[in-house]
Amino acid sequence: MHPTVSIAILNYQRRDVLRGALESARAQRFPVVEILAVDNGSTDDSVGMVRREFPDVRVVALDDNVGAAARNAGVAAAKGEIVVTLDNDVRLTTPDDVERAVAVFARHPRAAVVNFMILGPDGRLSRRDWCHPRDPDLWAEREFLTAYVLEGASACRRDAFLAAGGYWPPFFIGHEGLDLALRLLDRGHDLVYTPAVRVRHLVEPSARPSSRIYYTFTRNAFWVALRNHRPAAALGSLAQDLALMAYCAVRAGHARAFLRGVRDGLGGAPAALATRRPLSPATYRRLRALYGLRPSLFRRVLRHVRERLI
């Protein structure tokens, strides 16, 4: 017997883009129990559009923009045992995508999350969206266990997501998927990447990231380390993350954003430490195995430079 499935689409101020996401969700052959539009306090009539044009879609309307944490409200409101979570600019590419995601969960009974392959507007792998600890040139077409959650292009087991606490609201955006991944792994769950489900991300891959990315990713790297890692591991994780981010920020002309991120990452340390839950030794052993095929820091920097990822 198949599990029940909901589709939850996150939106903020992109009414016309949301329309396309809802249409791709409606086109699924798998009998989903519901489609939810989770709106982050939009003022562009997104909610009105959904209610007029998609009366079968359930609206979860938030008063304010709370960033990625709005997904928590969507998953909590969902009726399905599995919740497909998509951003408004992500499109399911075939009518069988949900059915394929369900099949991946059946193959991996310990999986809490199934991450999808993300394609760019040109239909090729979106290398900017590749967050897994594997070389995309070697692994993009293979299914494997990973150590990351792709927030806007994945499916989760609702109970596991909620039990792990969902996305920590102070992150707003940036590294919240890594933080949740660590907490799910620490609870004994698996995280899977599959090329069986391919979604298209409509963001133009050549678009230059704003300074906000360098700020939030730097700030949030501190909080991920403080919330999850033991001291030695925290220092190691931060050293690599900050080295890569500092280089990319300086190269892009956003050194000040990086420094603000360092300042506010340290300033937010008390709140992060208040929610601290250090990973167990068993989880560190799992992480060493999962990261065993990760390219070196030098290769990752080289890739970012060559492909201008951030």
What does each of the following model-derived ranges do?
Residues 24, 39-47, 91:
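A conserved acidic beta->alpha catalytic loop
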Residues 148-156, 160-165, 170-198:
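A short, conserved alpha-helix in the catalytic core of glycosyltransferases
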Residues 233-310:
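Non-catalytic, C-terminal membrane-associated alpha-helical segments of glycosyltransferases
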Residues 116, 130-147:
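Short, flexible, basic/aromatic active-site loop/helix in glycosyltransferases
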Residues 94-126:
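Conserved donor NDP-sugar-binding/catalytic core segment of glycosyltransferases
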Residues 83:
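Short aromatic/hydrophobic "clamp" motif used to bind/position activated sugar donors
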